[in-house]
Amino acid sequence: MHFAMKEKHENLWIAQRQGRAKDSNDRTQDSVLKMMAMAGEGDVTERLKELNIVPLAISYEYDPCDFLKAKELQQKRDDEHFQKSPEDDLINMQTGLYGYKGRIHFQTSACLNHELDELKELNLPKCDLFTAISETIDRHIHSSYRLFAGNYVACDLLMGDNRFTAEYTEEEKEHFEKYLEQQ
């Protein structure tokens, strides 16, 4: 990774997890950062600064795997021994790649090097430092997510109120409700 970036001047993209969290609440894993900090010069923050980490949030209007996630959660609820099959994983990957996502928004944050310097100044134990860096990345990603009309409609439907009606039209609400019915 360090060689590809420093010597070959290439950019790399690393997913936060081994896949999406069922509730879409993805969190950066400390172990990924530990792997990234294994090579390079200097202390942990210096090695990570060499990588010029830029958090990226990818927001989809629709999650193509929503019905698959719901099905799996229900199966796990109904059968504590339920395990997804390899075929289920392939279907999930295929659906995630090719399924309907609606509008897609990519949002990058600024490079984290300045914040890594600030975290270094705290003199945290190494384990706590990795956690603090993960939380910093997550904060940037979560604050960069784009919410679409369906997100607001879903929240209002779930909560049984009209708190976010200013964020969507009646037509968008009807469209989202129709989408839900088709799932």
Task: Give the predicted meaning of each segment.
Residues 2-12, 18-183:
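Membrane-interfacial terminal anchoring regions of lipid-handling membrane enzymes
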